[in-house]
Swiss-Prot record:
Name of the protein this chain belongs to: Small ribosomal subunit protein uS12
Ranges of biased composition (kind: Basic residues): 113-125
Disordered as annotated region, ranges: 105-125
Name of the coding gene: rpsL
Subunit architecture: Part of the 30S ribosomal subunit. Contacts proteins S8 and S17. May interact with IF1 in the 30S initiation complex.
Protein family per UniProt: Belongs to the universal ribosomal protein uS12 family.
Length: 125
């Protein structure tokens, strides 16, 4: 416990909270252009080919973001919407690409959790 004199001389230091998605600059989403679309492998103990894209954002940041869902239509120069949110088993991937927005189509034939994958409501028979 500091004395009053110590507090007068030094004061309390405020803890600085570090952002988990610095490239967003406090925005909910950011637009960007894909510079590279590729697959990568997750860290142990998982095994797969995860689809990721390197995206140059409108604020100049270059980030690696994850493409969720089964199948996608992304290529180089595709314009995408990026949101925060990391992928636990892919080191360095701290962003997600929003499905069904701008150049990225929603997941085809998706019946459940449709809003997360940009899928339209199926036609009722």
């Amino acid at each position: 416990m500091p004395t009053i004199n110590q507090l007068v001389r030094q004061g309390r230091t405020v803890e600085v909270v570090k952002s988990k998605s610095p490239a967003m600059e406090n925005c909910p989403q950011r637009r960007g252009v894909c510079t590279r679309v590729y697959t990568t492998t997750p860290k142990k103990p998982n095994s797969a080919l995860r689809k990721v894209a390197k995206v140059r954002l409108t604020n100049g940041f270059e980030v690696i973001s994850y493409i969720g869902g089964e199948g996608h239509n992304l290529q180089e120069h595709s314009v995408v919407l990026v949101r925060g949110g990391r992928v636990k088993d892919l080191p360095g991937v701290r962003y997600h690409i929003v499905r069904g927005s701008l150049d990225l189509q929603g997941v085809k034939d998706r019946k459940q959790s449709r809003s997360k994958y940009g899928a339209k409501k199926p036609k009722a028979k």
